[in-house]
């Protein structure tokens, strides 16, 4: 289908204006208290015992952000109802109706839900920290259309700050090094480098690079960034590839035939291919490093092919959003979402529902080599 880049830019700008008006000149969102019915129990049972790894450190974007943008001047926020409608405690900043994929992974690892860097205090940091930030990318300029965000480089710097905090709590450098070496690092970056950089007409990158060159550029930066995390002590890394971005409601809304944009899907292929090669190279070149790749695109294809088996009925529109495919403007404050959220793949214009997040978490944790390569998260966590 033909993809209209100018429309994407227009709707992004329109969303920014709408959110600015909703937040008011003070920058504070005015909300009206209303009762929220108790959410159903999570699809993954929380194991409150000892985890099989000491901690989980999370880096990424809005797919796994859990509140780091709440208190920065940004249009990329989800700390308002109906976000969190199915989360115990309501909206937190997660871009979802409930749990994210890394929430499910944390539970499967036997860990508590990992706190956002902006809120982590005291002994909480000993079990892990989530540094992910909506609109963030591998490249520092990515997401500038949303103003505030925390790019990957800054997220790594924030991890360094956490290490300093942990040093005062766990017996010094030796104890830190041992704990960090045995901990898991989850990284999910890159989607905004396309959606909020390369595909935006007001960014120069599309005129500077073809799709292969841009994929090469991203992975060059990515390699350096992951090596920084390795040099800070990380050894067990889970790196998520990009999904079928041409099938998200925001992109579907730009076309006229209701089909996924193969132009966008093909655009991100060089990135995924390069990431797989990068992981192989890092495993070979960095002593004791153990990187694994999560094939998010393959997970999505399986969900689409077997939607009935998963209890899903709606693949082409968001549960909460405005306009065509409920994807032209993403979920706004106090908008009424669909009642049958467990039957939807997408919660809003860009992000999966809790149901799909937890399906993918289980696949990442215990799936075969078609979704987790060369081993899955459970196997990675169990390695000495």
Swiss-Prot record:
The active site is at residues 62, 348, 351. One of its GO terms (molecular function) is hydrolase activity, acting on ester bonds. Transmembrane segments: none annotated. Residues 1-27 form the signal peptide. Keywords: Hydrolase, Lipid degradation, Lipid metabolism, Secreted, Signal. One of its GO terms (biological process) is lipid catabolic process. Its main location: secreted. Pfam families: Lipase_GDSL (PF00657). Its EC number is 3.1.1.-. It is found in: Secreted. The keyword S-adenosyl-L-methionine does not apply. InterPro entries: GDSL, GDSL_esterase/lipase, SGNH_hydro_sf, SGNH_plant_lipase-like. One of its GO terms (cellular component) is extracellular region. Belongs to the 'GDSL' lipolytic enzyme family. This is GDSL esterase/lipase At1g71691. The lineage of its organism: Eukaryota, Viridiplantae, Streptophyta, Embryophyta, Tracheophyta.
């Amino acid at each position: 289908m033909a993809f209209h880049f100018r429309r994407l830019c227009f709707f992004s700008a329109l969303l920014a204006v709408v959110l600015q008006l909703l937040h008011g000149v003070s920058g504070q969102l005015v909300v009206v208290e209303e009762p929220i019915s108790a959410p159903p129990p999570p699809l993954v049972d929380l194991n409150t015992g000892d985890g099989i790894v000491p901690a989980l450190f999370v880096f990424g974007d809005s797919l796994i952000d859990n509140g780091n943008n709440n208190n920065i001047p940004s249009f990329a926020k989800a700390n308002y109802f109906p976000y969190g409608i199915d989360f115990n405690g309501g909206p937190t900043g997660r871009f979802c109706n409930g749990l994210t994929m890394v929430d499910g992974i944390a539970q499967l690892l036997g860990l508590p839900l990992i706190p956002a860097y902006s809120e982590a205090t005291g002994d909480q940091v000993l079990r892990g920290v989530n540094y992910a930030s909506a609109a963030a990318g591998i490249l520092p300029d990515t997401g500038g259309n949303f103003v505030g965000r925390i790019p990957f480089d800054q997220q790594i710097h924030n991890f360094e700050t956490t290490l300093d905090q942990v040093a005062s709590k766990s017996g010094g450098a030796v104890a830190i090094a041992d704990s960090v070496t045995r901990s898991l690092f989850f990284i999910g970056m890159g989607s905004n480098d396309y959606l909020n950089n390369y595909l935006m007409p007001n960014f120069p990158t599309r005129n500077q690079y073809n799709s292969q060159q841009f994929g090469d550029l991203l992975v060059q930066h990515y390699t350096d960034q992951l090596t920084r995390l390795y040099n800070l002590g990380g050894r067990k890394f889970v790196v998520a590839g990009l999904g079928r971005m041409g099938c998200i409601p925001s992109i579907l809304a730009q076309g006229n035939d209701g089909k996924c944009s193969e132009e966008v899907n093909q655009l991100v292929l060089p990135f995924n291919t390069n990431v797989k090669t990068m992981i192989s190279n890092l495993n070979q070149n960095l002593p004791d490093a153990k990187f694994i790749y999560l094939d998010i695109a393959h997970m999505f294809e399986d969900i689409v092919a077997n939607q009935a088996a998963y209890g899903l009925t709606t693949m082409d529109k968001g549960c909460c959003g405005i306009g065509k495919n409920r994807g032209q403007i993403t979920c706004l404050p106090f908008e009424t979402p669909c009642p049958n959220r467990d039957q939807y793949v997408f919660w809003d214009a860009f992000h999966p529902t809790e149901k799909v997040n937890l399906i993918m978490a289980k696949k990442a944790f215990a799936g075969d080599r078609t979704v987790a390569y060369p081993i899955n998260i459970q196997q990675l966590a169990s390695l000495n």
